[in-house]
């Protein structure tokens, strides 16, 4: 007699700017949970978090997933409850393991992971510490530097350094003394290139800092480099393994949000055409990086590679990488011999480890 299926709570949507991407990622995860043997292994309960942080149960969540679009306010049941988390929706008390598919703040920064910890229920992906450190680029860079992993030169900044002319001038001089143009200004706690800008001169630097400061009080400015963009996927519980290495090529000046999520704007090469030594270095450093920040479960680790100088720099760790039909994480594992059916199963098997 076969055992009863495990009930998986797939949570998607969220308050971040990556809300729509989360819906698309959840579609892929839900598909994977219905493929092959997973049909017998798992029962899926969908939970949708709207842009105001309200949690909705399977009925509305199923409609959102089917349409692929967030509902209009007029389509939500009235009267609307107060924004934010007010308890689990009806129909979710049967969930045995949670599968968060939430990109950006509140999803991959340790927030929802902390909620699952308080509920004493297992969940897919990195824990509170690994999620929080990886999300904050300042904290992540400090941890990676402590592990001896090479990164491009960078300067950390605070939004309040732009509060008056004297402090702003001091910040600009600090950046210009440590970095050359072009450089990239990033909010420390957003993903999918949201809020990132490229500065070729001081005027653009000021504009980029002010833009990023509207989104995050913590900022990072990085040296621009002429390099290829490479990505490696990591999977596992207490023991991690790395996928083949992929490359992203794009027609834009840099890999911004529109380029990432618009069909035809970027091309992926899997596996990337690279020397064997570089491939092994990237795979090894991907696992080292996850260990440095305490990440288990899954991650996508991004690198820069200057083939003219044979130099590799670690860029960042994404603990809840995109899972859409054009996202690198599932494609890297597919090229490594792990199907979508196997991938979501392994991720669920690693939950709680």
Swiss-Prot record:
Required co-factors: Mg(2+); Mn(2+)
Binding site for Mg(2+) 2: 316, 318
SUPFAM superfamilies listed in its UniProt record: Glutathione synthetase ATP-binding domain-like (SSF56059), PreATP-grasp domain (SSF52440)
Top class in the EC scheme: ligase
Keyword rRNA-binding: no
Binding of Mg(2+) 1, residues: 302, 316
One GO term describing the cellular component: cytosol
UniProt binding sites for ATP: 176-231
Catalysed conversion reaction: 2 D-alanine + ATP = D-alanyl-D-alanine + ADP + phosphate + H(+)
Documented EC number(s): 6.3.2.4
Record pathway: Cell wall biogenesis; peptidoglycan biosynthesis
Subcellular location as annotated: Cytoplasm
Pfam families, alphabetized: Dala_Dala_lig_C (PF07478), Dala_Dala_lig_N (PF01820)
Domain ATP-grasp: 141-349
Co-factor binding details: Binds 2 magnesium or manganese ions per subunit.
Keywords linked to the UniProt accession: ATP-binding, Cell shape, Cell wall biogenesis/degradation, Cytoplasm, Ligase, Magnesium, Manganese, Metal-binding, Nucleotide-binding, Peptidoglycan synthesis
Superkingdom of source: Bacteria
One MF annotation (Gene Ontology) recorded for this entry: metal ion binding
InterPro entries: ATP-grasp, ATP_grasp_subdomain_1, D-Ala_lig_Van_CS, D_ala_D_ala, Dala_Dala_lig_C, Dala_Dala_lig_N, PreATP-grasp_dom_sf
Keyword ATP-binding: yes
GO biological process: cell wall organization; peptidoglycan biosynthetic process; regulation of cell shape
Family as reported in the entry's similarity comment: Belongs to the D-alanine--D-alanine ligase family.
Function of the protein: Cell wall formation.
Record protein name field: D-alanine--D-alanine ligase
Annotated organism of origin: Parasynechococcus marenigrum (strain WH8102)
The encoding gene: ddl
């Amino acid at each position: 007699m076969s055992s009863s299926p495990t009930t998986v709570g797939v949570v998607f949507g969220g308050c971040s700017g990556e809300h729509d991407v989360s819906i698309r990622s959840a579609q892929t995860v839900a598909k994977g949970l219905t493929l092959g043997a997973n049909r017998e292994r798992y029962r899926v309960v969908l939970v949708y978090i709207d842009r105001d942080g309200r949690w909705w149960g399977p009925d509305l969540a199923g409609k959102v997933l089917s349409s692929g679009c967030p509902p209009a306010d007029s389509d939500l049941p009235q009267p609307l409850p107060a924004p934010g988390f007010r308890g689990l929706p009806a129909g979710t008390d049967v969930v045995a393991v949670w599968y968060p598919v939430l990109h950006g703040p509140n999803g991959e920064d340790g927030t929802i992971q902390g909620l699952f910890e308080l509920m004493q229920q297992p969940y897919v992906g990195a824990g509170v510490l690994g999620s929080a450190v990886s999300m904050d680029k300042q904290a992540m860079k400090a941890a990676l530097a402590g592990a001896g992993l090479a990164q491009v030169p960078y300067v950390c900044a605070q939004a309040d350094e732009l509060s008056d002319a004297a402090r702003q001038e001091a910040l600009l001089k600090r950046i210009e003394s440590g970095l050359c143009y072009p450089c990239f200004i990033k909010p420390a706690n957003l993903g999918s290139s949201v809020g990132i800008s490229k500065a070729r001169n001081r005027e653009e630097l000021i504009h980029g800092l002010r833009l990023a400061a509207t989104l995050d009080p913590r900022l990072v400015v990085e040296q621009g480099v002429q390099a290829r963009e490479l990505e490696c996927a990591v999977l596992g519980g207490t023991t991690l393994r790395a996928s083949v290495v992929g490359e992203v090529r794009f027609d834009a000046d840099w890999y911004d949000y529109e380029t990432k999520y618009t069909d035809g704007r970027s091309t992926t090469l899997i596996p990337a055409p690279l020397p064997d030594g570089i491939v092994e270095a990237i795979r090894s450093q991907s696992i080292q990086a996850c260990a440095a920040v305490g990440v288990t479960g899954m991650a996508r680790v991004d690198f820069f590679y200057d083939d003219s100088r044979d130099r590799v720099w670690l860029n960042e760790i994404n603990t809840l990488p995109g899972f859409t039909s054009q996202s690198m994480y599932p494609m890297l594992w597919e090229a490594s011999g792990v199907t979508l059916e196997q991938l979501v199963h392994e991720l669920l098997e690693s939950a709680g480890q």
